[in-house]
Amino acid sequence: MSGLMVSTLGRSEAEVLAWDQYVLKSFEASGYHLSGWRRVIEEAFGHPTCYLTVRGENGALCGLVPLVFLASRGFGRFLVSLPFVNYGGMIADSAEGCRLLEAGAIEQAKVLDAQHIELRHEAPLATSWVSTERKVSMRLPLPPSYEDLLKGFPSKLRSQV
């Protein structure tokens, strides 16, 4: 037994700060993992959230997944990480941490009577979960200056920016 434990992120300043520090140190994270998106989703869209963490025996954060509960007549009840964006899946220091976050997400889905869970990652997970490639993302590396960026676009596109 490794001593890892899953819990729900609270609202204290210390917990939120630890979450954001973990996100900023992770190469797997996107800006959408930052805790500020929790407030945006709850306050602007009215969707409840459940941000899960994995902590070691010493209490240090070693994994997380931001989950949002969505319910609609058309799509049913489900948890997604994260809605409205293509990134926001699990981040963990170990495969065991990922497994614990998956188990925590499944438990939350049961509590909320959710029909499925969507975890949005850039790369496929090493899991038995069903995977889909219906989402498409496009990225553009940013050059050193705004002027260099504009030079890379055709003139018609530049006039629309």
PLM regions and their residue ranges:
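N-acyltransferase acceptor-side catalytic subdomain
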Residues: 1-161
